[in-house]
Amino acid sequence: MAVADLALIPDVDIDSDGVFKYVLIRVHSAPRSGAPAAESKEIVRGYKWAEYHADIYDKVSGDMQKQGCDCECLGGGRISHQSQDKKIHVYGYSMAYGPAQHAISTEKIKAKYPDYEVTWANDGY
């Protein structure tokens, strides 16, 4: 099983429109031989098809394991993505995983969508 290069894993993968659940996930690569520890990075995943935050995490963690990586869910929330208005709002929490650090999530989203207005709040579900 090949070990994934973390740089090849997109930081953000979210649906293009609507309000949907999202999770913030830390992905760990297996340590390279001679390396003191595994490398890691945070990724944001959000999809309309997910009824529960765990649905997203289960799919993503399964995909990452196939690439030789381990994952941990850092929390979740919701994303309101209005592509026509170029606005993304991150808010709320996951009943299963607790709230994600929305500040981290929004920084990653801003990097992918630099011409968008990206905001966050801890309130709401």
Curated annotation (Swiss-Prot):
UniProt-annotated location(s): Cytoplasm
GO BP of this protein: actin cytoskeleton organization; lamellipodium organization; negative regulation of T cell receptor signaling pathway; positive regulation of cell motility; positive regulation of insulin secretion involved in cellular response to glucose stimulus
Sequence positions bearing N-acetylalanine: A2
EC number: 3.9.1.3
MF GO annotations: actin filament binding; calcium channel inhibitor activity; enzyme inhibitor activity; protein histidine phosphatase activity; transmembrane transporter binding
Predominant subcellular localization, coarse grouping: cytoplasm
Tissue-level expression: Expressed abundantly in heart and skeletal muscle.
Top-rank lineage group of the source organism: Eukaryota
InterPro entries per UniProt: Janus, Janus_sf
Biological role: Exhibits phosphohistidine phosphatase activity.
Name of the protein in its database record: 14 kDa phosphohistidine phosphatase
Source organism of the structure: Homo sapiens (Human)
Gene: PHPT1
